[in-house]
Swiss-Prot record:
Bilayer-crossing regions: none
Motif 'HIGH' region boundaries: 10-18
GO molecular function list: ATP binding; tryptophan-tRNA ligase activity
Task of the protein: Catalyzes the attachment of tryptophan to tRNA(Trp).
Coarse class of the protein's main subcellular location: cytoplasm
Full protein name: Tryptophan--tRNA ligase
Family indicated by similarity: Belongs to the class-I aminoacyl-tRNA synthetase family.
EC number of this enzyme: 6.1.1.2
Reaction equation(s) it catalyzes: tRNA(Trp) + L-tryptophan + ATP = L-tryptophyl-tRNA(Trp) + AMP + diphosphate + H(+)
Subcellular location: Cytoplasm
Amino acid sequence: MKRSLSGIQPSGILHIGNYFGAMKQFVDLQDSYDGFYFIADYHSLTSLTKAETLKENTYNIVLDYLAVGLDPSKSTIFLQSNVPEHTELTWLLSNITPVGLLERGHSYKDKIAKGIPSNTGLLTYPVLMAADILIYDSDVVPVGKDQKQHLEMTRDIAMKFNQQYGVEFFKLPEPLILDDSAIVPGTDGQKMSKSYNNTINMFATKKKLKEQVMSIVTDSTPLEEPKNPDNNIAKIYALFNNIDKQNELKDKFLAGNFGYGHAKTELLNSILEYFGTAREKREELEKNMDYVKDVLNEGSKKARTIAIEKIKKAKEIVGLVGNIY
């Protein structure tokens, strides 16, 4: 079975855009791939500076993924910082990675353009990411179409290492393009993102979830008049309902005497119904945090066993003789 690997940054609360853009597909993939999913807490240090927030987010993400169906008996769920070999391999790869390659990274340039202070962690982020992927001999990496450059950089770094040392040591991972054709709109119409503060969080309290749904921006068409059925409410509603339900909502918009508030209520009910089982499961998991921590610890032990063997061989290839683990 081919190995699939993906990292999830604990940089904030997950939302329905994350779910349909990645989480749901990770769950669907776990029956056909040997899935490795890690909490990328080292990576999050490039943007998170509050220790308590990082700790809280880390466990929240594990809770979210377990609640939506990621199964520890099928997938390896682990914590990046529990496997120090990631950072050890990062140093080996840093010494064969051109600075120019890192400076050309889209993500790096975008963050600098947004005024995020440049630091070494931000610049060398792709090297750590390459180490994350290569240390497990990953066959595929699930990515969105706009993230392909990240994986291309990993492949470039792997090829550079292999060529420099005359070996075929690192496997060149292939992209597994996620179906992101239906980009989830946020409450303001832009792509749903924590950065835009326009998210709908599926595990929020019912009160908070209602506030988020009711904040969806609409036009000022009066209640009695027909409305454009191709609006943000309808687009989000389509994620949770079949075509018949979607057409019913469309007909209501076109008929008039159906307000955006009515549509938002229907959307809220759809979200609560769709995530009903997951919300209940998450509540139960929160009462058993020892289990959640055990999942992370056991997954980390399994991941580290693999990582140690890979780093031992990598150190031997470059001429380092220290191999005590």
